[in-house]
Amino acid sequence: MDSGEQGETSKAPLNKGVSRGVSILDLILRVIAVISTLASAIAMGTTNETLPLFTPFIQFKARYSDLPALTFFVVANSIVSAYLILSLPLSIAHIIRSGAKYSRLVLIIFDAAMLALVTAASSAATAIVYLAHKGNVRANWLAICQQLDSFCERTSGSLVGSFGAMVLLILLILLSAMALARR
């Protein structure tokens, strides 16, 4: 009977250590997601390129703000980045006090909402960037990336960061769900 009790007491510190490790991983993933969404918003928000057409006086300017889907992308990534920054203190609190159930549940709900927002924004922006690269012959939309290399490279790069943030948010949701299930 003593060995059973001893096994239970030795299991509690191990469980607490695992819970602390999960909380530290949660914090690290949140910091990386902040960097990813913020970099995506900044890269897209500062994207513009000017192309002289016939003379230096007639120019074509490509800016992210000309396309509503890209504007939505910048705003959505900024919102998700701000949320992730605001969630960092709660993530730190989970490291200190690992028994918090309700705050983890709140994080799961808001993480899922932010995942939906960044998914919608990334999908809308991906459609526009695809059209910029490939065009659409049936709709008579020409591909513009042959002329606007910098614009297309920056928009594509910001999409990569945003899709990376989507993966990180999925991992955060799964991590929080596993931490709740262990309790």
From Swiss-Prot:
Glycans are attached at residue 48. Residues 1-23, 93-104, 180-183 are cytoplasmic. One of its GO terms (biological process) is cell wall organization. The keyword Membrane applies. The chain crosses the membrane at residues 24-44, 72-92, 105-125, 159-179. It comes from the Eukaryota. The keyword Membrane applies. Residues 45-71, 126-158 are extracellular. Belongs to the Casparian strip membrane proteins (CASP) family. Regulates membrane-cell wall junctions and localized cell wall deposition. Required for establishment of the Casparian strip membrane domain (CSD) and the subsequent formation of Casparian strips, a cell wall modification of the root endodermis that determines an apoplastic barrier between the intraorganismal apoplasm and the extraorganismal apoplasm and prevents lateral diffusion. Homodimer and heterodimers. This is Casparian strip membrane protein 2. It comes from Triticum aestivum.
